[in-house]
Amino acid sequence: MEKLTVKEMSQVVGGKYYGNGVSCNKKGCSVDWGKAIGIIGNNAAANLTTGGKAGWKG
């Protein structure tokens, strides 16, 4: 893997990362299960400790 500079990153044309382990591009979507499982675990713990109101407005 190669680390890109800010200038190099600004020239990258690609897909979208949704922040939950899912990323999509023109060819389709993929899941980084390591990230997804960690996020699911964190969300489950937060919802258990807040009675299901973690991060929700209203």
Swiss-Prot record:
Top-level taxon of the source organism: Bacteria
Function of the protein: Bacteriocin.
GO BP terms in the entry: defense response to bacterium; killing of cells of another organism
Keyword Disulfide bond in record: yes
Pfam family, one: Bacteriocin_II
Signal peptide start-end: none
Disulfide bonds: C24-C29
Cleaved propeptide residues: 1-15
Keywords on record: Antibiotic, Antimicrobial, Bacteriocin, Disulfide bond, Secreted
Subcellular location(s) per record: Secreted
Name of this chain's protein: Enterocin-HF
Secreted keyword on record: yes
